[in-house]
UniProtKB/Swiss-Prot annotation:
It comes from Deinococcus geothermalis (strain DSM 11300 / CIP 105573 / AG-3a). Belongs to the MraZ family. Keywords: Cytoplasm, DNA-binding, Repeat, Transcription, Transcription regulation. Forms oligomers. It is found in: Cytoplasm, Nucleoid. One of its GO terms (molecular function) is transcription cis-regulatory region binding. One of its GO terms (cellular component) is cytoplasm. The gene is mraZ. The lineage of its organism: Bacteria, Thermotogati, Deinococcota, Deinococci, Deinococcales. This is Transcriptional regulator MraZ. Residues 5-47, 76-119 form the SpoVT-AbrB domain.
Amino acid sequence: MPFGEYPYTIDDKGRVVIPPAFREFVEDGMILTRGMEGCLYVFPLASWRRVEEQLEGLPITDAGSRAFVRFFYSGANKARLDNQSRVSVPQTLRAFAQLDGDVIVAGAPGRLELWNPERWAAAIQAVQQDPPNPELLANFVA
């Protein structure tokens, strides 16, 4: 499972280096898509297959499910690392996540996340100021 956060930059062509700690995780290819809180999710292909199964299991008769699938699935793009361990982020996804210049590459369970540094700082600060529901953390052992 990837963990940690690494500051990188995205070049003028929309390429960002994947940190060495995460390269093996996505070496067989990846799917980039819109994430929550304005970031991008980067799933290795094996994880993406599980995500697809979950999306396919959502009821098409539910408007909220359809909207989420549309948001999440329509933004998906297949990618591979180039010879310099970079991934090319499509312009539509860069615009969605406001990626221009500095980028935070963060690990998360089953995926990586690409963040605008200001959005990343705000997301971290929000958790510090208003921790998640205590019931969600009841079994968390620190």
